[in-house]
Amino acid sequence: MAVFKVFYQHNRDEVIVRENTQSLYVEAQTEEQVRRYLKDRNFNIEFITKLEGAHLDYEKENSEHFNVEIAK
């Protein structure tokens, strides 16, 4: 399993505005699994990136909201 960081907007019908971008962390095997896990939410997904090594460690140490959801 890997941890993915998802950048998204809360409303799929609105134009993406950088200042409104939110993020969340999802543990899954693939990016596709992350997208399936989030498909029922009304998110406008901007970008999904896999976190590994030093990048993952940095997010754990410096993100106030580092709560990982587990994709099922």
Swiss-Prot record:
<dbReference type="GO" id="GO:0003899">
    <property type="term" value="F:DNA-directed RNA polymerase activity"/>
</dbReference>
<protein>
    <recommendedName>
        <fullName>DNA-directed RNA polymerase subunit epsilon</fullName>
        <ecNumber>2.7.7.6</ecNumber>
    </recommendedName>
</protein>
<dbReference type="GO" id="GO:0000428">
    <property type="term" value="C:DNA-directed RNA polymerase complex"/>
</dbReference>
<comment type="function">
    <text>A non-essential component of RNA polymerase (RNAP).</text>
</comment>
<dbReference type="Pfam" id="PF07288">
    <property type="entry name" value="RpoY"/>
</dbReference>
<comment type="similarity">
    <text>Belongs to the RNA polymerase subunit epsilon family.</text>
</comment>
<keyword id="KW-0804">Transcription</keyword>
<comment type="subunit">
    <text>RNAP is composed of a core of 2 alpha, a beta and a beta' subunit. The core is associated with a delta subunit, and at least one of epsilon or omega. When a sigma factor is associated with the core the holoenzyme is formed, which can initiate transcription.</text>
</comment>
<keyword id="KW-0808">Transferase</keyword>
<dbReference type="GO" id="GO:0003677">
    <property type="term" value="F:DNA binding"/>
</dbReference>
<keyword id="KW-0548">Nucleotidyltransferase</keyword>
<dbReference type="InterPro" id="IPR009907">
    <property type="entry name" value="RpoY"/>
</dbReference>
<keyword id="KW-0240">DNA-directed RNA polymerase</keyword>
<dbReference type="GO" id="GO:0006351">
    <property type="term" value="P:DNA-templated transcription"/>
</dbReference>
